[in-house]
Amino acid sequence: MNESQPKLKYKRILLKFSGEALMGKSQFGIDPSVLDSLARDIAELIHMGVEVGLVLGGGNLFRGKALSQAGVGRVTGDHMGMLATVMNALALRDALERIDLPARIMSAIPMLGVVDPYHRRKAITHLRNGQVVIFAAGTGNPFFTTDTAACLRAIEIGADIVLKATKVDGVYSADPLKNSDAKRYDYLTYKEVLTKGLEVMDSTAICLCQDQGMPLQVFDMAAPKALKRIVTGERVGTIVGANHDQ
């Protein structure tokens, strides 16, 4: 790393980006400008020496809840959602490669000829070689969210932290768009998230991070230079860890 570069607090991160965020201001699909902006932010991290893994949701292309109400089975719906995350991963890989940033997609569901199958040791090698690794198809199993997949992959690859990009600047006691008295938290413990019922991630993801001591940081992706500020140690959004001194 160049001496002029700021000192890094986090050398390897797992970024969780929701499918809905990829829509931008649209109601469905992928906004190319959002992809390009995300790709530029990731490129900045790579040039700083940060190793970046990503997990994308699929809610911009597929909404399992609506199909479930129409009678489609949960397992079928979850498998369809996994395929949606692969489509988002392909779009992001293309955006990264357009700016000459090497990227690999590793899918929990084998799709030879389209993406690579997930392999932990190969993923770590790619990260060490400066490639962005996009983990697709969730965990490969129904009944598990992409949030849980993000935490699982972060633990497997030895990431320093899970960064969850959202549309608000952290975790609140209530929906800040509906309740002006909602309180924003700077720090939370895993236990506080679970006992307060805060919508940070689903309980399976939180418990997994708690068991393995994996910290989380929830932040507003639209905040200027958010990712760069986080990896250099600035407090952006809400940090979730074992204690308030995380």
Swiss-Prot record:
InterPro entries: AceGlu_kinase-like_sf, Asp/Glu/Uridylate_kinase, Uridylate_kinase, Uridylate_kinase_bac. This is Uridylate kinase. The keyword Repeat does not apply. The keyword ATP-binding applies. It comes from Legionella pneumophila (strain Corby). Pfam families: AA_kinase (PF00696). Its main location: cytoplasm. ATP binds at residues 16-19, 59, 63, 166, 172, 175.
